[in-house]
UniProtKB/Swiss-Prot annotation:
The keyword Disulfide bond applies. It is found in: Secreted. It comes from the Eukaryota. Residues 135-176 are annotated as: Disordered. Disulfide bonds join C85-C96, C107-C124. The keyword Transcription regulation does not apply. Binds to the lipid A moiety of bacterial lipipolysaccharides (LPS), a glycolipid present in the outer membrane of all Gram-negative bacteria. Potent antimicrobial activity. This is Cathelicidin-2. The lineage of its organism: Eukaryota, Metazoa, Chordata, Craniata, Vertebrata.
Length: 176
């Protein structure tokens, strides 16, 4: 009797563990990584863009450390750069080379990690183009000439002038 009860209890536990094992991997497999969510947002930015060329992810700021539900919005910050591929191409932006002196944009906003909920709110602003200019060679700046420091010379201190002692000539009063 005890063995039947124990096997029934073991059967229930195995059923619960099996169900739990089936539910958890499917939920975690569906969630996108932070980088994948940003790449999807870049793809949608390219689709909605009216510019001639595609943009590709140039730099991704670190993900926030908080673990949240995949359906909630996560703040993102990244930089994209213009590629050589025209927007009409079917080629993924990751396979396109960056355009030399292409536009660079800083993007901030929110994305969700849930692939079924493709919501994102991203705003991109063009960064000032920073072009490399070789440094101008100028002669080194020399400080103005200053002679080495010398303390002021003081004349020696002399005692006040006293005439030399001369014994008196002649009889001295009080002496005989």
């Amino acid at each position: 009797m005890e063995t039947q009860g124990a096997s029934l209890s073991l059967g229930r536990w195995s059923l619960w563990l099996l169900l739990l094992g089936l539910v958890l991997p499917s939920a975690s497999a569906q969630a996108l990584s932070y980088r994948e969510a940003v790449l999807r947002a870049v793809g949608q930015l390219n689709e909605r863009s009216s510019e001639a060329n595609l943009y590709r992810l140039l730099e991704l700021d670190p993900a926030p450390n908080d673990e949240v539900d995949p359906g909630t919005r996560k703040p993102v910050s990244f930089t994209v750069k213009e590629t050589v591929c025209p927007r009409t191409t079917q080629q993924p932006p990751e396979e396109c080379d960056f355009k030399e002196n292409g536009l660079v944009k800083q993007c901030v906003g929110t994305v969700t990690l849930d692939p079924s909920n493709d919501q994102f709110d991203i705003n991109c602003n063009e960064l000032q183009s920073v072009r490399f200019r070789p440094p101008i060679r100028r002669p080194p700046i020399r400080p103005p000439f200053r002679p080495p420091f010398r303390p002021p010379v003081r004349p020696p201190i002399r005692p006040p002038f006293r005439p030399p002692f001369r014994p008196p000539i002649g009889p001295f009063p009080g002496r005989r």
